[in-house]
Amino acid sequence: MQITDVRIKLLNIDNRLKAIASVTFDDEIVIHDIKVIEGEEGLFLAMPSRKVGNDRYRDIAHPISSPAREKIETAVINKYNEEFEKQSSVETEPVTEENMETAENENE
C-alpha cells in the first residue's frame, strides 16, 4: 500500500500533543485521529484507540510490520514539520499607531 495523502491539524496548545493526522492509503482507505506527540526523544505517533476497561486503551487501527510503521511515521512527521514551518514563517507586524492609521486609510 502506498500513502497517497497526509493531512495534519496543528494544535496550538502548550502540551505534548502537537497535532492530529489523517493518512490515506492508495486513495482508497483513510486512518483518522493519529496523534503526533512530543516525547523525551522527539516526536512519535499514537494510533487511534478507544478505551477498554478503566485504564486500558486498544488501538482501533495500527500497522502490523515495523517497515509499515516507519513509513507512516516518516510521512506524518515530515508533513507535521512542513506545516509547522509554514505556520512559523507567517510573520506578523507589530501593531503601532502608524500602521493602524495606514490600515484605516486603506479601508476608507
From Swiss-Prot:
One of its GO terms (biological process) is sporulation resulting in formation of a cellular spore. Pfam families: SpoVG (PF04026). Keywords: Cell cycle, Cell division, Septation. The keyword Amino-acid biosynthesis does not apply. Residues 94-108 have a biased composition (Acidic residues). InterPro entries: SpoVG (IPR007170), SpoVG_sf (IPR036751). Residues 84-108 are annotated as: Disordered. The keyword Transcription does not apply. Could be involved in septation. Belongs to the SpoVG family. PANTHER family: SEPTATION PROTEIN SPOVG-RELATED. This is Putative septation protein SpoVG. It comes from Finegoldia magna (strain ATCC 29328 / DSM 20472 / WAL 2508). The gene is spoVG.
